[in-house]
Design a protein with these regions (language model features):
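Conserved G1/Walker A P-loop phosphate-binding module
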Residues: 2-98, 104
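Structural recognition of the conserved hydrophobic beta-strand(s) that form the central parallel beta-sheet
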Residues: 98-99, 136
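Inter-motif core of Ras-like GTPase G domains
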Residues: 108-143
């Protein structure tokens, strides 16, 4: 995970019907920053989102605070789940889990240094069970990356 990800929130029960989205990318690609920006937009720009993003475990809120207060911490978690619920205006709410991942773990999966095993709590398991992957790429990274 990037150096900006906080310690994971206490495990919250994850709705089995939740949409599962994994932010996948190398270290410093901006995965945590995207989640922090989403939390900021949810707090200040609900109209632009056309709904309300509920963060029951307050994990995104903590991440946003760390990002905007510039309190960076290194974490060793392979994945950090952020359970949320999006309530579009006039529509039923949608449960989702946003997974932030460790860039080193992503690199190890891509270079096949880590097996693609479907185990709970691993990046491989999150990827294999995801409804969608959001690929974050650092455009300023060298081409060799």
């Amino acid at each position: 995970m990037s150096a900006l990800s906080p310690s994971p929130p206490p495990p919250a029960p994850i709705d089995p019907a939740a949409l599962r989205l994994v932010l996948f990318g190398m270290s410093d690609a901006g995965k945590s920053s995207l989640l922090g920006a989403l939390a900021q937009a949810a707090e200040t720009q609900a109209r632009a989102l056309h709904g309300h993003l509920n963060d029951p475990a307050h994990g995104l809120e903590e991440l946003r605070k760390k990002l905007y207060d510039d309190r960076q911490t290194e974490t060793q978690q392979e994945i950090v789940p952020y359970p949320v619920r999006f309530s579009p205006y006039g529509q039923p709410s949608i449960p989702a889990v946003l997974y932030d991942c460790d860039g080193k773990a992503a690199n190890e999966l891509l270079t096949q240094k880590r097996p693609m095993e479907n185990r709970e709590g691993t990046l491989a398991g999150a990827v294999l069970n995801a409804d969608g992957l959001i690929l974050a790429v650092d455009a300023s990274a060298p081409h060799s990356q």
